[in-house]
């Protein structure tokens, strides 16, 4: 497996964001030292050399939400809507906006193929 590029960008501040403290009513004094929820998650997939981790994470979150483990949603569908190019990175908020406004198609409708930027494209 090729070493994946990390393309997640920190979302810009948005006045609609709420600090977590706003939702915590009771004080939690004891937390477990570890939590492993991996048994309920889709398997890790290979994004190749493209910085498309946000697209893969978003597709996997939707698969988890719908308990869809026998097939995949298309990270390519999401990446094509939120990335300028293979190396531009992406904001998680933009990926969530794609799910909200457009949904996401199954992998078989738009298969993922990594798009790798090379300097030869700039010449």
Task: Give the ranges of each region predicted by the language model.
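Predominantly the structural core of cysteine protease catalytic domains
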Residues: 1-6, 31, 59-63, 82-123
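Generic secondary-structure boundary/loop-capping signal
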Residues: 32-34, 38-42, 75, 101
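Alpha-helix initiation and N-capping motif
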Residues: 34, 71, 75, 92-96
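A short glycine/serine-rich beta->alpha loop
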Residues: 39-50, 82-86
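Alpha-helical support elements that line or immediately flank enzyme active sites
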Residues: 47-70
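Acidic helix-start/capping segments at beta-turn-to-alpha-helix junctions
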Residues: 72-85
């Amino acid at each position: 497996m090729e070493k994946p590029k990390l393309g997640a960008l920190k979302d810009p501040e948005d006045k609609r964001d709420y600090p977590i403290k706003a939702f915590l009513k009771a004080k939690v004094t004891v937390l477990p030292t570890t939590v492993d929820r991996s048994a309920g998650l889709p398997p890790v997939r290979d994004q190749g050399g493209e910085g498309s981790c946000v697209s893969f994470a978003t597709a996997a979150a939707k698969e988890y939400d719908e308990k869809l483990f026998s097939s995949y949603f298309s990270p390519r569908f999401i990446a094509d809507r939120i990335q300028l190019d293979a190396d531009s990175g992406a904001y998680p908020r933009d990926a969530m906006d794609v799910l909200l406004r457009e949904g996401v198609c199954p992998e078989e409708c738009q298969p993922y193929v990594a798009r790798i930027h090379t300097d030869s494209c700039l010449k």
